[in-house]
Amino acid sequence: MCRFLISTPFSRRRGERKAEAGRMARSVSYVSAAKLLAMARSNPRVAIIDVRDEERSYQAHIGGSHHFSSRSFAARLPELARATGDKDTVVFHCALSKVRGPSCAKMFSDYLSETKEESGTKNIMVLERGFNGWELSGQPVCRCTDAPCKGTCSPEEPEL
């Protein structure tokens, strides 16, 4: 395995490096559909955030997910921080998790850092391949119209 180290200039004082490390403490990582399903089933402190826009209204969604449209996402950051305050992990996704999902995850991470939000959120993740990949890999989906989805879609689609 190759590892790359990023060095910091010697002129930086130790305190400056520590402060920078604190600002970068919340990073965004990716999680596979299978791993997310296992996490969500075993840990009630996982929140799934769907940032698709109108697609959610005519496509299925991940059971129990919360909808925060990417179009109004920035304005709803305080609401999202409150809604996920008791969660260890928050996982974002859009259709493919190439633009909206990662962008919203980064925006949320930055918001928590900038506002010093005392939230329980420790891990901010993005679902690999997004909702389309989730569905294509055979993971359970929900077609309810509840807002927010309660995750009780049908007997063969267990609550997450």
From Swiss-Prot:
Signal as UniProt keyword: no
Keyword vocabulary terms for this entry: Oxidoreductase
EC category name: oxidoreductase
Catalytic activity: [glutaredoxin]-dithiol + arsenate + glutathione + H(+) = glutathionyl-S-S-[glutaredoxin] + arsenite + H2O
Family annotation (InterPro entries): Rhodanese-like_dom (IPR001763), Rhodanese-like_dom_sf (IPR036873)
Induction summary: By arsenate.
Domain Rhodanese: 42-143
EC number: 1.20.4.1
Active site: C94 (cysteine persulfide intermediate)
Pfam family, one: Rhodanese
GO molecular function per UniProt: arsenate reductase (glutaredoxin) activity; phosphatase activity; protein tyrosine phosphatase activity
One GO CC term on file: nucleus
S-S pairs: none
Function: Possesses arsenate reductase activity in vitro. Catalyzes the reduction of arsenate [As(V)] to arsenite [As(III)]. May play a role in arsenic retention in roots.
Protein name: Arsenate reductase 2.1
Organism annotation: Oryza sativa subsp. japonica (Rice)
Taxon lineage: Eukaryota, Viridiplantae, Streptophyta, Embryophyta, Tracheophyta
Gene transcribed to yield this protein: ACR2.1
